[in-house]
Design a protein with these regions (language model features):
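Short low-complexity stretches enriched in small and charged residues
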Residues: 4, 40, 44-46
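Short amphipathic alpha-helical surface micro-motifs
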Residues: 8-10, 49-50, 66-68, 143
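Rossmann-like dinucleotide/flavin-binding elements
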Residues: 28-40, 50-66, 70-127, 155, ...
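Rossmann-like dinucleotide-binding cores of NAD(P)H-dependent redox enzymes
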Residues: 1-23, 98-152
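Local beta-strand N-terminus motif with an aromatic residue
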Residues: 20, 43-45, 173-175
Length: 221
C-alpha cells in the first residue's frame, strides 16, 4: 500500500520502469546478489548498491503483545488491531495513521482508535508546506489522538507508559504498537573500489536525494 499523501509517487515508479524497459535494461526480480556472483558473472562490472534502508525498532519495547513497523503495515505484511499506538510522529508515522484511520465521513468506518506519540513539540518536525498542514488537519478530522512533547518510558506486555509535561500516563487498552522511529542504512559490507552506494543505503534521505545521487554517480561513471 501507498500512504494517501504519496499516491502520486506511484507515477514516478511507473515512469522509471518504462524507461528501463525502453532502454532494454535487464531487470532480474527475486534475485539475491551473492559474493560469488560479483566475483564471477559481474567481475568486470562497476557495482551500484541501492539496497535502501531498514526500519528501526526499539528492542525493549517489543515485549508488547503485538508490535510491528510502519513498513510492515504499509506493505501488508502485518495487520494491526483496533486500538493502535504509533510511536513516532514524523512523516512516516503520520502517513501510517492517515492510512489506518477511517475515511472522513465514512459510512462504514473501521472503528480504529489511533494514538500518535511524538517526543518533539510538533508533528513531522523539519518538514513544512501545504502537505504537512493538510495531513495534520486530516488526522484531526479523522479523530487521531496526537500526543506531543511525549516520551515513552516503559512498555510491558499490556501497558504503554509515557511522560508528558512531568506527568506519567498509561495506555492499557491498546492491542498494537507500531514503530515509526526512523530508518537505518541497509548497507552491504564491501570495500572494493568498484562498489558504489547510493540512496538510503548510503545515507537515509528523500526520494529526490536518491534520484540525484543516482544521476550524479552515472555521470561520474
Amino acid at each position: 500500500a501507498v500512504p494517501i499523501a504519496k499516491q502520486e509517487l506511484c507515477k514516478v515508479i511507473k515512469f522509471m520502469a518504462r524507461r528501463l524497459k525502453n532502454e532494454g535494461i535487464e531487470v532480474r526480480m527475486n534475485c539475491e546478489v551473492t559474493p560469488e556472483m560479483l566475483a564471477g558473472e559481474f567481475k568486470d562490472y562497476e557495482v551500484v548498491c541501492s539496497t535502501g534502508a531498514v526500519p528501526k525498532e526499539i528492542p525493549p519495547f517489543k515485549v508488547f503483545k503485538q508490535t510491528m513497523t510502519a513498513d510492515d503495515v504499509l506493505a501488508g505484511r502485518k495487520y494491526p488491531g483496533r486500538k493502535i499506538v504509533i510511536l513516532g510522529g514524523g512523516s512516516v508515522g503520520c502517513e501510517t495513521a492517515d492510512y489506518l484511520a477511517p475515511l472522513i465521513d465514512d459510512m462504514f468506518p473501521a472503528n480504529r482508535d489511533i494514538t500518535v506519540i511524538e517526543m518533539t513539540p510538533s508533528l513531522m518536525p523539519g518538514e513544512g508546506g501545504a502537505a504537512k498542514s493538510q495531513l495534520t488537519m486530516r488526522l484531526k478530522r479523522k479523530g487521531v489522538k496526537i500526543e506531543l512533547n511525549s516520551q515513552v518510558t516503559k512498555v510491558d506486555e499490556t501497558t504503554i507508559t509515557y511522560e508528558k509535561d512531568g506527568q506519567e500516563y498509561h495506555i492499557t487498552d491498546a492491542d498494537t504498537l507500531i514503530f515509526a522511529v526512523g530508518y537505518a542504512p541497509n548497507k552491504v559490507e564491501n570495500t572494493e573500489e568498484r562498489v558504489h552506494f547510493i540512496g538510503d543505503c548510503d545515507k537515509v534521505g528523500t526520494l529526490k536525494d536518491a534520484i540525484a545521487a543516482g544521476h550524479k554517480l552515472a555521470e561520474e561513471l
